[in-house]
């Protein structure tokens, strides 16, 4: 059976009136933990988050069986929790017009929407959780921003073109799958940024240091762990799964829990 660890971060923000809890899933890639993902479900249910945030890549673009794995898991979670789903590069590729499994992906997305899951593709959703006003923003980057090894710079202007501006009256969460552009995300002004994509850098040396990114950048700046700047926080998950080359060294799969407090 696949194994994972839980990592809990405590994030303080003066906009918070009352403590709120989040569970963050990134890079599931169709992984299964226990029968019907019961081990993963139990951990989340025991934590009892106020909402579940998906930072992309729940599926593998060339493996349609991962759609069913993710569908079962997310439909179960949606019965008890609000779920917000931002796109990773695998979702973006899978729903492209020319993709062989586009129809299967669109059916998957349609069913999850029917179950109440909020998909955010350069969209935002206002929600009140534990008496706090949040805006959950889901960034979907064009695929050229995932090119290996070179991808364009994400400017502040492009970021605003894709996402608009954050709401100054609310607590802004940004679900942004690719952590390469962490500097731009901080400048944009989200209170909490959640990313994945790098799978912890394959070989993880410490809380924040991994060997290589998914775009073959050695020792990427925002590889894994928590980062802070001007009162803002960015958390990069090492992910719950992997694809193509299932290699992890000193780098366990992880489920993220976040406690936001005043």
Feature names for model-found ranges:
Residues 21-24, 52-54, 85, 174, ...:
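Residue-level marker for buried hydrophobic side chains located in beta-strands
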Residues 205-220:
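Short, surface-exposed loop/helix-turn segments at secondary-structure junctions
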Residues 27, 56-57, 88, 177, ...:
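Active-site glycine-centered loops adjacent to acidic/histidine catalytic or metal-binding residues
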Residues 16-41:
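Short extracytoplasmic
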Residues 15, 28-30, 91-192, 223-262:
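Conserved catalytic scaffold of divalent metal-dependent phosphoesterases
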Residues 191-199:
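Short hydrophobic/aromatic-enriched beta-strand-loop microsegments
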Residues 1-16:
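N-terminal membrane-anchoring alpha-helices
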């Amino acid at each position: 059976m696949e194994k994972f660890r839980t990592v809990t971060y405590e994030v303080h923000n003066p906009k918070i009136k009352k403590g709120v809890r989040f569970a963050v899933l990134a890079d599931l890639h169709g992984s299964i933990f226990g029968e019907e993902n019961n081990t993963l479900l139990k951990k989340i249910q025991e934590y009892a988050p106020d909402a579940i945030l998906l930072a992309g890549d729940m599926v593998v673009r060339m493996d349609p069986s991962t759609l069913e794995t993710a569908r079962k898991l997310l439909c179960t979670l949606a019965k008890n929790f609000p779920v917000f789903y931002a796109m990773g590069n695998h979702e973006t590729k899978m729903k492209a017009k020319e993709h062989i499994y586009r129809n299967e992906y669109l059916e998957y997305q349609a069913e999850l929407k029917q179950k109440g899951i909020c998909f955010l593709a350069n969209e935002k959703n206002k929600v009140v959780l534990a008496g706090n006003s949040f805006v959950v923003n889901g960034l979907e980057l064009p695929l050229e921003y995932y090119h290996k090894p070179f991808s364009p710079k994400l400017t502040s202007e492009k970021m605003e073109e894709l996402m608009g501006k954050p709401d100054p009256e609310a607590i802004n969460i940004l679900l942004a799958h690719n952590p390469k552009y962490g500097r731009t995300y901080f400048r944009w002004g989200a209170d909490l940024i959640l990313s994945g994509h790098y799978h912890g850098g394959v070989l993880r040396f410490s809380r924040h240091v991994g060997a290589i990114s998914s775009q073959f950048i050695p020792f990427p700046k925002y590889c894994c762990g928590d980062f802070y700047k001007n009162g803002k926080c960015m958390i990069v998950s090492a992910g719950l799964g992997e694809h193509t080359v299932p290699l992890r060294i000193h780098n366990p799969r992880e489920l993220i829990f976040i406690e936001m407090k005043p």
